[in-house]
Amino acid sequence: MDRAVSQVALENDEREAKNTWRLIFRIAILLLTVVTLATSVASLVYSMGASTPSDLVGIPTRISRAEEKITSALGSNQDVVDRIYKQVALESPLALLNTETTIMNAITSLSYQINGAANNSGWGAPIHDPDFIGGIGKELIVDDASDVTSFYPSAFQEHLNFIPAPTTGSGCTRIPSFDMSATHYCYTHNVILSGCRDHSHSHQYLALGVLRTTATGRIFFSTLRSISLDDTQNRKSCSVSATPLGCDMLCSKVTETEEEDYNSAVPTLMAHGRLGFDGQYHEKDLDVTTLFEDWVANYPGVGGGSFIDGRVWFSVYGGLKPNSPSDTVQEGKYVIYKRYNDTCPDEQDYQIRMAKSSYKPGRFGGKRIQQAILSIKVSTSLGEDPVLTVPPNTVTLMGAEGRILTVGTSHFLYQRGSSYFSPALLYPMTVSNKTATLHSPYTFNAFTRPGSIPCQASARCPNSCVTGVYTDPYPLIFYRNHTLRGVFGTMLDSEQARLNPTSAVFDSTSRSRITRVSSSSTKAAYTTSTCFKVVKTNKTYCLSIAEISNTLFGEFRIVPLLVEILKNDGVREARSG
C-alpha cells in the first residue's frame, strides 16, 4: 500500500516539474520578444530621426535613375551581343564562303593545268590580291530599300593604264573586250596600222593580268602576259573570256567588208584561241561549214564571254541563209519592247509589220540578222564540242553585238541596240545541257544609245534600221531574292551622234547623278563596264573601258575609266565630272 502511494507521489512530482519548466520557457520567450520589440522600436525611432519625408519622396527618383543606368548598360551589352552575332553568324561564314570559292577556283585552274601539262598549257596560275577575294563576279550591292539612283559614280580616279595606245597619227586601236574571273582578267583589242576603216589587215592585242593594290591602297591592273597577234590572219570582232586555262578568245577571220560578207553564200571563218598562263598562244579554226551551216555571215559579239559549267559561252550574231532551216523556223516571229511611259502612237498592225521587217534590214541584202550563243568545252584541246544555240525572235530583237555576263549565280546576255529599241537590254539566261535559254529582258529606259533617225535615242516605235553603238551595262544592285535592280554603265548621252560619254547608275526608269568624261561634244564609241569590290575596305568600284576620240595619236584611244560607287540619299541626278 505504501509502495503504491509512493509511486503516485513520484509521478505527481515529475508532472509538476515539467509544468515548472514550461512556465520558465514561456517567460523566457516572452522576455526575448519584448526585448526584440523594444530594439525594433528604438531602431525605427532612430531611423525616423535620420530620415525626413523629403528623403522618402526622392527614393522613387533614385530608383528610376538606377533603373535607367541598368537598362542603358544592358542595351550597350545587347549592341555588343548583336555585333558578335553578326560577325559570328553572318559575316565570318560569308567571308569563309568567299575564300572557299576563290580557293576552289584556283584549285580548278591548277587542276586544268596539271592535266594539260604535257600539252604545254602553262604553269603558275595567277590570282588577284587577297583584298579582292569574294569581291569579283558577286552581287556587289544587295539592297531592298534604297533608291537605286542614290548610288552614283565618283569622279574618275587616276590609276595605272594597262591598255596600249596608238603611237602614230594613222594608228587605230578599237573594239575592246574584257572579262574578269575570281582569279584573273583578260583583255583584247584590235590594232589597225592605217586607219580604223581598213578591213584588209590588222593584228590583235591580247593580255592576261590580275588586280593588285598598292601600299597606299590604290587599285591597279597588273598585266602578267600579253601578245600581239601580228600575222597573216585578219581577226575581227573578237570576244575574250577568263577561263581556268587562261584567256579564251573567239574571233572571225575576214578579208572583205561587212556588207560583202553578208552577200556571200558561205559562213565566215571563225577561230577559238587561247593565251595560256605561260604566255603562249594557240588557236584552232572552227568547222563553220557544219556549225554555221545555215549562215552567210557570223561574228562574235565583241563583248566578253563567260565560263559556265566547264564551258566558255560567247554571244554571236550574223545573217541567216534565206529559206534555210534556221531561217524558216524564225519566219513570222517578232517581239516589240516598249519605252517606259512613252507609248508608240502607231496602229498595232503597223507596229507588228515594222517589227517583223526590223529583222531583215536592207543594208545587208534583206538577210535575217540573228542573235545566237556559242558554247565551247574548255579543255586543253581548242574548239572542242562547240554547240550553237539560236534563241527565238519572240524573245530577242534583231541580232547584234553582245556580251555574256555572270554575276553571282545569275547569267545575262547584253544585246547592243542596233535595231529600233534604244534602252539597254539584259536578257536573263539559263544554261542546261550545253545550250542556253533567254528570257524576257530587263530594260533600262534612261540608259540609251545614239542612233540614226528613225531609231534615235528617243525612238519609241518599231522600225527597220542598223544603228546604235555597243555600251554594255553591268549588273550592280540586287534584291535579296537575287532579282536585278540596277546597273552601272557608260552611255553616249546624245540623240544621234556618238558624243558625250557619261557614267551613271541606272534603274529601270531613271539614272543617278552622272560623271562625264569631258564636255558634251567629246567624241566616243564602244564602252564595256565591269564592277568589283575591295572586300578589305568594302568599297565598290566600276571600270568602264571606253573608246575616246584622240586627235593626235590615232582616231580613238581606249581608256580604262575607274570610278568608286558612292551613295547619296535623296539625289536623283546631278551633273558632275
Curated annotation (Swiss-Prot):
GO terms for molecular function: exo-alpha-sialidase activity; host cell surface receptor binding. The chain crosses the membrane at residues 27-48. Disulfide bonds join C172-C196, C186-C247, C238-C251, C344-C461, C455-C465, C531-C542. Its EC number is 3.2.1.18. Residues 1-26 are intravirion. The keyword Cell membrane does not apply. Residues 124-152 are annotated as: Important for interaction with fusion/F protein. Glycans are attached at N119, N341, N433, N481, N538. Gene3D superfamilies: 2.120.10.10. InterPro entries: Hemagglutn-neuramid, Hemagglutn/HN, Sialidase_sf. It is found in: Virion membrane; Host cell membrane. One of its GO terms (cellular component) is viral envelope. It is a single-pass type II membrane protein. Homotetramer; composed of disulfide-linked homodimers. Interacts with F protein trimer. Interacts with host CG-1B; this interaction inhibits viral adsorption and replication rather than internalization. Mediates the viral entry into the host cell together with fusion/F protein. Attaches the virus to sialic acid-containing cell receptors and thereby initiates infection. Binding of HN protein to the receptor induces a conformational change that allows the F protein to trigger virion/cell membranes fusion. The C-terminus (head domain) is involved in binding the cellular receptor. Belongs to the paramyxoviruses hemagglutinin-neuraminidase family. This is Hemagglutinin-neuraminidase. It comes from Newcastle disease virus (strain Beaudette C/45) (NDV). The gene is HN.
